[in-house]
């Protein structure tokens, strides 16, 4: 049996506040997650020999560090299944961009192999396997827009208004660990409630506490923010960056902004198509109401 073109959607952090730090060094966060239709796709073919094979390459990522492989082996160990899988991956979500691509791929692997192998784990059981893989992995298994607290394990579903987004990736890679270890990072933001978040339009609520550190350390990102502002777009960073996003009421408005930005860059002689040396990605995307695989798991 084979599962083809299984989606792994990107996420946006609509806001991200750092409200504390645990004794073990993990930061306590408050954030709101929303999935968008920018997605990786994975393929899973069952193997009877129990092996987990990787039919793709990720530049700079060893197989032992690959979250997809780790997720597959974690499910294997937890269930005791003797089945294996050959896994393919087509990347569209930028790596290291703050859009949760690796985490989403891992979650889709847990969900898809749970279905392919017939291991029958519930959503809560899959979420328990997800958390050790990374703080963002559980929300993709949770499968809904969520208000998150703690280190990623405390999730509450929230209903968000329809929206679209323009996602821009500056020409920079931002290591998450570097940002969280910066001495100037705000770590004592006042806590907010779900009611606080829902009382305002999502584009107006809060901030990303990681953004000032990234803007100070990475001139490619701060330059992108300034350039976009000069061209009429107020953007916010997702996660630890470097991807930026602007919210729009409808997809046609986001597409128009994409076209205007890319046209401006073409006139300046800096681009063909949708990218140029300063922006690796300029993409209009629709905000999703839920994960496309949400119904693949028994609650």
Curated annotation (Swiss-Prot):
GO molecular function: 4-(cytidine 5'-diphospho)-2-C-methyl-D-erythritol kinase activity; ATP binding
EC annotation from Swiss-Prot or TrEMBL: 2.7.1.148
Keywords of the record: ATP-binding, Isoprene biosynthesis, Kinase, Nucleotide-binding, Transferase
Gene3D superfamilies tied to this protein: 3.30.230.10, GHMP kinase, C-terminal domain
Residues given in the record as ATP binding sites: 94-104
Tagged with keyword Nucleotide-binding: yes
Catalytic activity: 4-CDP-2-C-methyl-D-erythritol + ATP = 4-CDP-2-C-methyl-D-erythritol 2-phosphate + ADP + H(+)
Pfam family, one: GHMP_kinases_C
Pathway(s) where this gene product acts: Isoprenoid biosynthesis; isopentenyl diphosphate biosynthesis via DXP pathway; isopentenyl diphosphate from 1-deoxy-D-xylulose 5-phosphate: step 3/6
Positions annotated as active site in the UniProt record: 11, 136
Biological process, per Gene Ontology: isopentenyl diphosphate biosynthetic process, methylerythritol 4-phosphate pathway; terpenoid biosynthetic process
SUPFAM superfamilies: GHMP Kinase, C-terminal domain, Ribosomal protein S5 domain 2-like
PANTHER family: 4-DIPHOSPHOCYTIDYL-2-C-METHYL-D-ERYTHRITOL KINASE, CHLOROPLASTIC
Biological function: Catalyzes the phosphorylation of the position 2 hydroxy group of 4-diphosphocytidyl-2C-methyl-D-erythritol.
Matches recorded under NCBIfam families: ispE
Family affiliation: Belongs to the GHMP kinase family. IspE subfamily.
Protein name: 4-diphosphocytidyl-2-C-methyl-D-erythritol kinase
